[in-house]
C-alpha cells in the first residue's frame, strides 16, 4: 500500500494468489523454475513528504477490512503505535502469521 495524506490510497499491489481446489496457490513469484514467469511488477511513484508505504503479508491484510487497514495507516500517530494496532487486530481476528513494515517519507 502507498498512501498520501489528503489523497488516500495511491497504489496497492495485486496479490498473485489463486484458489485451486480450495487451496491458495502462488500464481506468480520472482523465484521460479520458469524464467518467462519471473518478471517483476514494477511501478514508479513519485513519493512526497508524509507519504506512507506499508509492506505486509496476507496474514495482516486478511485480518481486517481494507478501510480499517488504510485508515489506521494514515493515523496521526507514531508508526510504532500504528503497528501495535495492527498487531492487536491480527492477534484478535487473524488466523495466520503476519508481517508488516510501515515507512514514512521525509
Q: What kind of region is each of these model predictions?
A:
Residues 6-49:
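Conserved, helical-rich catalytic subdomain that frames metal- and/or nucleotide-binding sites
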Residues 31, 35-56, 60-106:
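C-terminal catalytic subdomain
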Residues 2-3, 64:
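Hydrophobic beta-strand positions
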Residues 3-8, 105-106:
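Short acidic-glycine loop/turn motifs at beta-strand connectors
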Amino acid at each position: 500500500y502507498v498512501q498520501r495524506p489528503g489523497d488516500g490510497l495511491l497504489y496497492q499491489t495485486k496479490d498473485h494468489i489463486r484458489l485451486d481446489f480450495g487451496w491458495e496457490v502462488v500464481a506468480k513469484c520472482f523465484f521460479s523454475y520458469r524464467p518467462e514467469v519471473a518478471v517483476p511488477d514494477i511501478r514508479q511513484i513519485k513519493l512526497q513528504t508524509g507519504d506512507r508505504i506499508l509492506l505486509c503479508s496476507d496474514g495482516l491484510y486478511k485480518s481486517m477490512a481494507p478501510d480499517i487497514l488504510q485508515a489506521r495507516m494514515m493515523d496521526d500517530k507514531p508508526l510504532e503505535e500504528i503497528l501495535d494496532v495492527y498487531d492487536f487486530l491480527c492477534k484478535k481476528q487473524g488466523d495466520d502469521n503476519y508481517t508488516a513494515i510501515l515507512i514514512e517519507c521525509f
